[in-house]
Amino acid sequence: MSLIPSSIRLLRLLPALSSTSVLMFALDEHLIFGTWMHPTLRERANTTLPPWWTKGGLRWRWVIIIGYPLTYLLGILNLLVARDELQATGSTLWYTTGLLFSIAHMAYVGTALNWIANIENGMPKGNVTYSMGNWLKMNWTRALITDLPAWVCFITAALKVL
């Protein structure tokens, strides 16, 4: 197998891999951050969450800063490289739809940043878990509406073309 066909096959698979990582990150956020909502932890969470989120955000933000743009780039590259192959296998629609679902994740940025600001600033005072609960609901909804369908589309596209 020559380098060019192998490279194209790898390119076809990469959006599925990158969207898997961002979907897993969203699931990890839900599982790990949701622990703060347990009734036995709420009182401590209301004082600990603001600094924890502020410090943690500096550590995990790279997943978002790299993961989504990488998925966009890989989706676009797939639509541009060996387009006749995509057309012949019916994968063009799947890569396009996966890309659009992935981009749709950013429609939630304003809402997400508002809830995050509330958490980091300890708002509402004495009940930060209220903001955390709302962020968790928004994050789960966003994952189900954007990240999961993007992942399914990219997996389907790769399976059709490979």
From Swiss-Prot:
- Could you tell me which species this protein originates from? Xenoacremonium sinensis (Endophyte fungus)
The keyword Endoplasmic reticulum is annotated on this UniProt entry: no
Q: What happens when the gene is disrupted?
A: Abolishes the production of xenoacremones A and B.
Sample GO molecular function, one term: oxidoreductase activity
User: Where does the signal sequence lie?
Assistant: 1-19
Q: What does this protein do?
A: Epoxidase, part of the gene cluster that mediates the biosynthesis of xenoacremones such as xenoacremone A, a compound that shows inhibitory activity toward the PI3K/AKT signaling pathway and which has the ability to induce apoptosis of A549 lung cancer cells. Within the pathway, cooperation of the hybrid PKS-NRPS xenE and the trans-acting enoyl reductase xenG is responsible for the formation of the reduced tyrosine-nonaketide derivative. The alpha/beta hydrolase xenA then accelerates intramolecular nucleophilic attack to give a pyrrolidone derivative.
UniProt topology in membrane: Multi-pass membrane protein
Per the record, the pathway is: Mycotoxin biosynthesis
Which gene name does the record give? xenD
Superkingdom to which the source organism belongs: Eukaryota
EC annotation from Swiss-Prot or TrEMBL: 1.14.-.-
Record-stated family: Belongs to the epoxidase xenD family.
What positions does the record give for glycosylation?
46, 127, 139
**Keywords for this entry?**
Glycoprotein, Membrane, Oxidoreductase, Signal, Transmembrane, Transmembrane helix
Q: Where in the cell is it found?
A: Membrane
Membrane-spanning regions, if any? 62-82, 99-119, 142-162
- Which GO cellular component term is one of those annotated? membrane
Top class in the EC scheme = oxidoreductase
**What is the protein's given name?**
Epoxidase xenD
